[in-house]
Each structure stands twice: as C-alpha cells, then as structure tokens.
A protein has these predicted regions:
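Conserved alpha-helical positions within TPR/SEL1-like repeat arrays
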Residues: 71-82, 108-123, 149-163, 190-205, ...
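Helix N-cap/loop-to-helix boundary motif
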Residues: 60-69, 104-111, 145-151, 185-193, ...
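Terminal, low-structured helical/coil segments at or just beyond the last alpha-helical repeat
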Residues: 281, 285-328
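N-terminal leader/linker segments that initiate helical-solenoid repeat arrays
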Residues: 28, 33-75
C-alpha cells in the first residue's frame, strides 16, 4: 500500500490510473486502486481517503507550493472516483486544476487532471464533456512532448469510444495503446490489462467474438499472473470471457465462466453499485440458458441490493447516473 508520507516528502503521486472496472463495465470504477498488482480493499480505500481529506485541508497556497497542493487534490479525486463518490471527485479534480494552473504550471499534472476528469465524465454518462477533456489532455501531452503518457490518453479515448459504440475508433486506439504498453517495461499492469479488455470489448461490439475471446483469454492469463485467481481483475476477466462466449452462441462454455466471475466479483465488488449490473447480466444469461430458478434467485438478490442502495441518497443518485448498458 502506498505510504502517505512518500507524497508529503517527495511531492509525487504514485498512481493516477483509471479503474479496470471503468474500462470494461462501462463506467463503474470500483474495488480500489491498483498499484504494481496490489489491490486496495474497501477498508484500505476508506483509510487512504481519510488521510488525503485531512491533507487537503492545508493543501493551499501559501502553506505549500500550488503544484504540490494540486497533486494532493488530484489524488483525492482519484480516491473519490474509485469509491464511486462522483460529485466529490469532480469537485476535487476541478480544484486541483485551479491549483495546477498557477505558475509555474506543471503540464504533466494538469494533463493528468484533465484526463481523470474525462474518465469521471464518462462514468457519469456525460460523454460530450468527457471527449472534450480527453482530447485536451492528449493535445497537452503531445505539445509538452510527454511521449510516455500518450498511451494512457489513447487508452482512455478508446474507453470513451466504447461508451459511444464507436467500436472502430475504440479498437484503433485500444490497439495502439496495447502495443505501446506491451513495449514499456514501466507500464502499470492495470493499463496493460485494461487495454486488452477494451480491445476485446470493442470486438464484441462489432460481433467479432472469436477475436474478442482470444484477447480475453490472454487478459485472463495476465490477470491470474498479476493478481491471482480470486481478485477483482481476474473475476472481471472471467465474467467478460463468459459473456463473449455467451454472445458467440456457446452457452456451455459461458456458464461456468460467468458463474465463477460473478462469484469472485460478489466477494470483491459486492459493496459497490456496479455489482448490480454484473448480476443483471448474469440473470439474463441464466434466462437464456433456461435456468429459470437460478435466474429468479439472482433477480431477487438484485431487488434486495437495489432497495438497500436506493435507501442511501448519494448511492441512489449514483445508480441513476451509471450507464453500464452501453456494453451489453
């Protein structure tokens, strides 16, 4: 787990990456940040968020340089976004950008803030502003000569185009990002994995299921090696591979994969609204597979979870914002 003291002493943010869930389940960032194949639990995420909330109270000029304060607010936005607290994430990102535009301007950090804001807009269904932010982040990185950061912009643009069902554009940018990440020894593992999943999802959108399945199988092997068999990324890979088999017409191969994937996601993601949409797809699959009793049990679980989540105003509002259906 990242040490908060490292941020204070070295003035660096150690992870500003998007969630794999955002990539593959159309806008549900969840399950915690990942760094070097280590996953933060919900408790870890809450604890780190609390630390950064405390730090943000004094993260203003003249108490510290604007760029340092901006990085603290930027990372706080990432933590809020990973927890699904979208409104607070937007406020944190916008405040970070105000700080980061104070001279001397840090172009890499400002581009990161724009990039993160773009992913947040995409998660909440604001695709027009998302595309505007992502393209501006890409232009800023190109103008500043930040070649190592360009693949991340391609990756996030691919994700956005996936939301918009522009599968050809998504495939082009995902392929470009995947090739760049595969050649970069310092690329974060979640970026390597995420681009494979975006690439596979774009192929699913255009009904090229054999090609999608091949990429998902590669992603599953990578996920198992990086994270282990019981962690959220592996559960998501497993579920998506099952989904691709289902849509290709192979319900026999799909069944155990979707069941296992949903079980893993239930253990690692069950606290988050995103899990409702996993269950919804699984219930629909069970209906198609003529497993009516099993489907009914899942549908009852969905109703119970939705009732519980709707009883919490912030989460209930978030459920209305999440636009996961675009992938399915």
């Amino acid at each position: 787990m990242r040490a908060f003291s490292m941020l204070c002493s070295k003035f660096v943010i150690l992870s500003r990456s998007s969630s794999i869930i955002l990539t593959c389940l159309a806008a549900c960032s969840a399950g915690g940040l990942r760094l070097n194949a280590q996953i933060l639990t919900q408790e870890d995420l809450q604890n780190e968020t609390a630390e950064y909330e405390v730090a943000s109270r004094s993260a203003e000029p003249p108490h510290m340089p604007p760029v340092v304060a901006g990085r603290i607010w930027l990372h706080l936005g990432v933590l809020y976004q990973d927890a699904g607290r979208f409104g607070q994430a937007e406020i944190a990102y916008e405040h970070a950008m105000r700080l980061l535009t104070i001279a001397p301007v840090s172009r890499p950090d400002l581009a990161d803030a724009l990039d993160n804001l773009g992913t947040l807009y995409a998660e909440s269904g604001n695709l027009k502003d998302a595309e505007h932010a992502e393209k501006n982040a890409l232009k800023m990185r190109e103008a500043a000569g930040l070649k190592s950061e360009l693949p991340r912009s391609w990756y996030h643009l691919a994700t956005l185009y996936l939301h918009q069902h522009r599968s050809a554009n998504a495939r082009e940018f995902a392929q470009r990002a995947a090739e760049a990440f595969s050649e970069d020894r310092n690329a974060l593992p979640e970026n390597k994995l995420g681009t494979l999943l975006v690439l596979a999802s774009s192929l699913c959108q255009s009904h090229q299921y054999p090609e999608a399945i091949a990429h998902l199988q590669s992603a599953l092997q990578l996920s198992n090696n990086l994270y282990g068999p019981e962690q959220l990324p592996t559960g998501l890979n497993t579920f998506l591979l099952g989904y691709a088999y289902w849509k290709s017409g192979d319900l026999v191969s799909a069944n155990p994969l979707m069941q296992r994937g949903s079980d893993i996601l239930g253990k690692t993601l069950g606290w988050h609204p995103a899990y409702l949409f996993v269950l919804t797809q699984y219930a629909q699959f069970l209906r198609k597979a003529h497993q009516q009793d099993a489907a009914h049990a899942i549908e009852q679980e969905i109703k119970q979870k939705r009732t519980h989540l709707n009883s919490e105003p912030k989460i209930g509002q978030q459920l209305q914002m999440i636009d996961i259906a675009v992938l399915f």
